[in-house]
């Protein structure tokens, strides 16, 4: 991006981008189902102690790579070299595969609310079969161009934000007016128990507070530079944390936590709100269902093609075959997108075998999505730790405090993420075969494949090129400048 186009995003614009990237009403539902009102303080703690420092970590990487439109691959390569950069970029794409398994059933459920006014209850097998068909359709549409996707998604995202704020205001007003909440709001209910099961669910909280990697890339584009960026990120983190916490406190004003479903929980709470205020419940269900369905279907189309395109465009040529990464007339690697489809199929089928209901199925896939989502930030944190330990002399306009501060902050984050990852990968009460073949097996197979592919690529390089690829890119750039 040219300098003339830099410094064009105002503080409010960055605040809006941050909110859109991070906040989701469905995250409130998911965590309320699992840990109830204890999610309220945990959301706030996650945004303060994870989202804000992680944003600052990425902002430092962007500052280090200021002459490039940096992505995950470039950030990690600048500190750890090519192999770990490839593994990190690969995990971002790999996490997306698990994300589909939790997104697809929701799209189906909200379609039911939109067109029927209620959720048509499906078995896990039927849910998986419909998800396969829906994903095939989404892959076809996204690889053949979807020009109206952007405007539609923008409108529905705005409507979802409006609905969320409306619910908070109306539920808060009802509470102030003397309504007894369906689940009592007490200090005892909000105190976390920090059991192994609870630690596993904290990954859901961290996943909900994610999005820093899509926001921090704008550090060079904000009016006022890095100082303004830091101020806005801190304000945004506090605002999002407070909003998540308030929404979590009010989510059970009209509906009991144990009656909420992962697939249609958003509609359920609005149905309860409609019943309290005497509004037509069926119309409310259809409206919220339609908005949610449109927003999630748009998200499905976007995430079907975009991560594939980004991943295969930023990694070195030669790791994958030319036909795999070849772009079609719409600028999408269609063959790679269909390979992605074939990989997701078993990820949807395997948890179905150990699930008695669609709710059980969703619990399994959301848990694994949350566990897998810990890996990419973990690699970035390890790269940052190496940057502050061994490469802190490299010039950059922005640093997250002193060397000691940076090392201390990222070390705490690495410890928290490591425990959360283990707790969610080995959840209490889960089927042991599901854990071995799905949770552990999926990660081992996918990361093992990435390691093998990079070994083959490295073997094709000359000794000089191999040594250069292994060295931190920021160090190489400094030596050649």
Mark where each language-model region is.
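Membrane-interface "cap" regions at the ends of multi-pass membrane proteins
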Residues: 1-41, 45, 51-59, 65-67, ...
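C-terminal membrane-solvent junction of multi-pass transporters and transport-like membrane proteins
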Residues: 5, 327-330, 374-425
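Helix-loop-helix junctions that connect adjacent transmembrane segments
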Residues: 7, 41, 121-126, 151-289, ...
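Transmembrane helix-loop boundary segments of multi-pass membrane transporters
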Residues: 31-42, 115-124, 147-156, 347-379, ...
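Hydrophobic transmembrane alpha-helices that form the core helical bundles
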Residues: 56-60, 68-135, 140, 296-310, ...
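TM-loop-TM module centered on a large, flexible mid-protein loop between adjacent transmembrane helices
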Residues: 74-75, 81, 235-301, 320-369
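Helix-loop-helix connectors at the membrane interface of multi-pass transporters/channels
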Residues: 77, 104-127, 163, 221-225, ...
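Membrane-interface loop-to-helix entry segments
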Residues: 111, 128-180, 210, 233-238, ...
């Amino acid at each position: 991006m040219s300098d003339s186009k830099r410094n064009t995003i105002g503080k409010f614009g960055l605040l809006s981008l941050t909110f859109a990237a991070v906040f989701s009403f469905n995250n409130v539902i998911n965590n309320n189902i699992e840990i109830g009102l204890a999610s309220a303080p945990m959301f706030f703690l996650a945004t303060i102690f994870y989202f804000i420092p992680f944003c600052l970590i990425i902002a430092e990487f962007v500052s280090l790579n200021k002459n490039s439109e940096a992505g995950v691959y470039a950030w990690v390569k600048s500190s750890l070299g090519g192999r770990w950069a490839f593994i990190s970029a690969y995990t971002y794409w790999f996490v997306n595969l698990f994300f589909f398994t939790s997104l697809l059933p929701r799209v189906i459920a909200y379609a039911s609310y939109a067109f029927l006014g209620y959720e048509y209850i499906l078995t896990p097998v039927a849910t998986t079969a419909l998800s396969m068909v829906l994903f095939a359709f989404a892959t076809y549409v996204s690889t053949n161009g979807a020009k109206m996707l952007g405007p539609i998604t923008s409108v529905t995202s705005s409507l979802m934000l409006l609905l969320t704020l409306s619910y908070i205001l109306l539920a808060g007003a009802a509470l102030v007016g003397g309504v007894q909440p369906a689940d009592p709001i007490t200090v005892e209910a909000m105190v976390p128990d920090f059991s192994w099961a609870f630690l596993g669910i904290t990954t859901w909280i961290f996943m909900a507070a994610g999005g820093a990697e899509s926001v921090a890339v704008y550090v060079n584009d904000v009016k006022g530079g890095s100082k303004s960026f830091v101020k806005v990120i801190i304000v945004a983190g506090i605002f999002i944390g407070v909003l998540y916490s308030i929404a979590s406190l009010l989510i059970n004003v009209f509906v009991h936590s144990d009656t909420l479903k992962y697939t249609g929980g958003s509609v359920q709470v609005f149905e309860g709100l409609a019943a309290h205020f005497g509004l037509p419940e069926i119309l409310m269900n259809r409206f919220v269902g339609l908005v949610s369905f449109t927003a999630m279907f748009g998200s499905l189309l976007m995430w079907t093609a975009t991560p594939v395109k980004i991943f295969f465009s930023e990694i070195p040529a030669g790791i994958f075959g030319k036909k795999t990464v070849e772009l079609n007339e719409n600028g999408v690697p269609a063959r790679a997108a269909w390979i992605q489809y074939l990989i997701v199929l078993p990820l949807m089928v395997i948890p179905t075998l150990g699930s008695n209901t669609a709710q059980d199925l969703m619990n399994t896939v959301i848990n694994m999505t949350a566990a897998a989502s810990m890996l990419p930030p973990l690699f970035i944190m390890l790269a940052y730790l190496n940057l502050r330990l061994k490469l802190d002399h490299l010039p950059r306009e922005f640093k997250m405090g002193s060397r000691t501060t940076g090392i201390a902050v990222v070390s705490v984050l690495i410890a928290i993420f490591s425990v959360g990852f283990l707790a969610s990968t080995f959840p209490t009460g889960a089927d042991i075969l599901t854990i071995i073949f799905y949770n552990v097996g999926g990660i081992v197979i996918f990361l093992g494949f990435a390691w093998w592919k990079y070994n083959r690529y490295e073997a094709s390089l000359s000794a000089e090129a191999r040594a250069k690829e292994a060295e931190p890119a920021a160090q190489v750039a400094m030596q050649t400048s």
